[in-house]
């Protein structure tokens, strides 16, 4: 089969936003105008095509990023047909993992902002993640029909809060209930979408007289931004020459792809205005797979040589699995992005992370929640494979003869844990299987069994995250569970350097055991992790035993020494020791390493660390005193305040331990008018009173 759409006409994009910016509605409209979805689903009624998990329909927030394929030729059919793959990303902070994961596989993104709420704290989080992955972006200021809508103010916030350079390509004609259409600043025309056919067709007129001055000024800014793309355009601009529409678009595209500017559009998805022009912008300014740097990976050799895979059909096949979903009809769906090469159904590919082969039995392309079986996928495509055996999020799928591991995604460690037990004994096994499936779908969710109590402990990124997991147990797997009180994920570390001997000797007839080491144990900077250094000279500890010493020390730290929590940021140096020709073994040195670690750790001024969360509360001014007082009572430190569109924004650092049940307390303190977001910030030393209590409990 030949390629239907040239790869230059692909756009793999994500739509990212704060919870209520109207992202799902915008995505719905995109699907409507691109002719796949003939009935526009409204989030308010809980029926949007993209929101296909039933919980999302109840909560009205988007949890799983579904991937959808759509086609677009422009409002005037002015382009050849382009293929747009849309990855829907959740806006809720407990799901930033989903956002990271989708940003990893997209080439460009649309950031949706509410014209009233502007840049909310959550938008900043997502924006930072997009910057980390160098994703070119456009902005869509939505909800222009709402009371208090102000396009200029939101553009200014993008500049000041997100430290970006927005370039408005449109101006709104009217606002709030007078919002009628937009001025297209590139072509200097006014566009009014027809309400009879839900905005499929539109009228084009001259710019309204009352907006002429403002439009001329805005266009000057836009043309200058385009001219800065290259010397040829700049020279023409400085010599007073008019840039053509083509030249302006060429300049804007180059600067958007270089992450220098953010083209800004406006509209009201709900009122069917502006999304059509936004789609033209996707084609005009966002990258195709060919416009972004070739993906890098490690080859299957001893050195892990770094190689690239270019986005071409003639390259060896390489793809990244970015989401696992359990589908009630077909079982496990593995969503993957193809970076290079071609693969057909029935082909066998290799997963280098697991070291296993996988056969691609069926490949489907998803449209939100309906699916189409396809025979092959090519570079640039996003599709889902049915029933792969052992592939987790972040794994690579590649050609068996050209093995490569694309960079792993990094997932944060969970910060909150709860014990769960099934309400009926008979559900124990069912619950175990269900939790295993959910953990495979979501790497930021972990399951383990507590060795002492035998309880099943689940851990995640926040209370909402775990609520949804428990909810899914009930809904998808029919397991009713009781949930214990939330537990905080503490860590341990040390404050000073010590030297410690560890000696494990057993001599009792026959072969004995002999392992003897000297370790230098020292603290590392926060987030530096565990480091093992071998400084043995002259073979006093033979080479083959050194990994065992490392393993013994590391496992002792992993299991916790002070109070049973994993110890972090510790450097271990093996600098001396001795061995016995007959009695020494790997096991003996592992025990010696572990003994030295446990003893040395307790002498190295050990401390307990607690997770500190970044909390951002948006509250009406009259409740500000109460909210701040409450944060102080929770051992919080307020770091700053500013005026937001819907009240004061208070930024604080608060220990996670003090934040349980905060949502309910905040609601009652402010009569439901305040909202907050919270995400993990860093580990800090826990105060002695709290540490002592926890250590006492552990012993």
Curated annotation (Swiss-Prot):
One of its GO terms (molecular function) is GTP binding. GO terms for biological process: ribosome disassembly. One of its GO terms (cellular component) is cytoplasm. It is found in: Cytoplasm. Keywords: Cytoplasm, Elongation factor, GTP-binding, Nucleotide-binding, Protein biosynthesis. It holds the Pfam family GTP_EFTU. GTP binds at residues 17-24, 88-92, 142-145. InterPro entries: EFG_II, EFG_III, EFG_III/V, EFG_IV, EFG_V, EFG_V-like, EFTu-like_2, G_TR_CS. Residues 8-290 form the tr-type G domain. It comes from the Bacteria. Belongs to the TRAFAC class translation factor GTPase superfamily. Classic translation factor GTPase family. EF-G/EF-2 subfamily. Catalyzes the GTP-dependent ribosomal translocation step during translation elongation. During this step, the ribosome changes from the pre-translocational (PRE) to the post-translocational (POST) state as the newly formed A-site-bound peptidyl-tRNA and P-site-bound deacylated tRNA move to the P and E sites, respectively. Catalyzes the coordinated movement of the two tRNA molecules, the mRNA and conformational changes in the ribosome. This is Elongation factor G. It comes from Alkalilimnicola ehrlichii (strain ATCC BAA-1101 / DSM 17681 / MLHE-1).
């Amino acid at each position: 089969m030949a390629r239907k759409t040239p790869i230059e006409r692909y756009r793999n994009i994500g739509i990212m936003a704060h919870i209520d910016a109207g992202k799902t509605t915008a995505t719905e409209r995109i699907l409507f105008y691109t002719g796949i979805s003939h009935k526009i689903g409204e989030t308010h009624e809980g029926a949007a095509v993209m929101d296909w998990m039933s919980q999302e329909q109840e909560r009205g927030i988007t949890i799983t990023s579904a991937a959808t394929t759509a086609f677009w030729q422009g409002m005037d059919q002015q382009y050849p047909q382009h293929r747009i793959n849309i990855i829907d990303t959740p806006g809720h902070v407990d799901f930033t993992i989903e956002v990271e994961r989708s940003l990893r596989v997209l080439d460009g993104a649309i950031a949706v902002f509410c014209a009233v709420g502007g840049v909310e704290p959550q938008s900043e989080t997502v924006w930072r993640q997009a910057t980390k992955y160098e994703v070119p972006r456009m902005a869509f200021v939505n909800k222009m029909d709402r009371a208090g809508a102000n396009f200029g103010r939101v553009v200014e916030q993008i500049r000041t809060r997100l430290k970006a350079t927005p370039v408005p390509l449109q101006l709104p004609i009217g606002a709030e209930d007078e919002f009628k259409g937009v001025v297209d600043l590139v072509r200097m025309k006014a566009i009014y979408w027809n309400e009879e056919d839900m905005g499929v067709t539109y009228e084009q007129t001259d710019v309204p007289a009352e907006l002429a001055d403002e439009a001329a000024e805005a266009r000057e800014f836009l043309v200058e931004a385009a001219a800065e793309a290259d010397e040829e355009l700049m020279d023409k601009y400085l010599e007073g020459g008019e840039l053509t529409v083509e030249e302006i678009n060429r300049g804007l595209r180059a600067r958007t792809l270089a992450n220098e500017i953010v083209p800004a559009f406006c509209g009201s998805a709900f009122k069917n205005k502006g999304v059509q022009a936004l789609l033209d912008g996707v084609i005009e300014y966002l990258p195709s797979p060919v416009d972004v740097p070739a993906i890098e990976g490690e080859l299957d050799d001893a050195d892990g040589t770094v190689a690239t895979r270019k986005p071409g059909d003639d390259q060896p096949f390489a793809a990244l699995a970015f989401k696992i979903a359990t589908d009630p009809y077909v079982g496990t769906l593995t969503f993957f992005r193809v970076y290079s090469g071609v693969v057909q159904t029935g082909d066998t590919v290799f997963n280098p992370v697991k070291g296993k082969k996988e056969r691609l039995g069926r490949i489907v392309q998803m449209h939100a929640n309906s699916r189409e079986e396809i025979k092959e996928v090519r570079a640039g495509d996003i599709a889902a494979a049915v029933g792969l055996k052992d592939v987790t999020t972040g794994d690579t799928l590649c050609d068996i003869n050209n093995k490569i591991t694309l960079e792993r995604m990094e997932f944060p460690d969970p910060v909150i844990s709860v014990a769960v037990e099934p309400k009926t004994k008979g559900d124990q096994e069912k619950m175990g299987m269900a939790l295993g499936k959910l953990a495979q779908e979501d790497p930021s969710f972990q399951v383990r069994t507590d060795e002492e109590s035998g309880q099943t402990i689940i851990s995640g990124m926040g209370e909402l995250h775990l609520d949804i997991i428990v909810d899914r147990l009930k809904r998808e797997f029919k397991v009713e569970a009781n949930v214990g009180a939330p537990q905080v994920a503490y860590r341990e570390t040390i404050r000073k350097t010590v030297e410690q001997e560890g000696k494990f000797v057993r001599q009792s007839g026959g072969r004995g055991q002999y392992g003897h080491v000297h370790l230098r144990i020292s603290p590392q900077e926060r987030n530096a992790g565990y480091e093992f250094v071998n400084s043995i000279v002259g073979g006093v500890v033979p080479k083959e035993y050194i990994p065992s010493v490392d393993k013994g020390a590391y496992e002792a730290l992993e299991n916790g020494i002070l109070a049973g929590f994993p110890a972090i940021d510790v450097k271990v140096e093996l600098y001396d020791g001795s061995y016995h020709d007959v009695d020494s073994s790997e096991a003996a040195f592992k025990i010696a390493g572990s003994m030295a670690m446990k003893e040395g750790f307790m002498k190295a001024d050990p401390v307990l660390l607690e997770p500190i969360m970044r909390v951002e509360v948006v509250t009406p001014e009259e409740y500000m005193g109460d909210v701040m007082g409450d944060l102080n009572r929770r051992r919080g430190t307020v770091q700053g305040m500013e005026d937001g569109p819907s009240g004061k924004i208070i930024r604080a650092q608060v220990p996670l331990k003090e934040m349980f049940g905060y949502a309910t307390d905040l609601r009652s303190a402010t009569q439901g008018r305040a909202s907050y977001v919270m995400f993990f910030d860093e580990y800090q030393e826990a105060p002695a009173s709290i540490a002592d209590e926890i250590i006492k409990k552990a012993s």
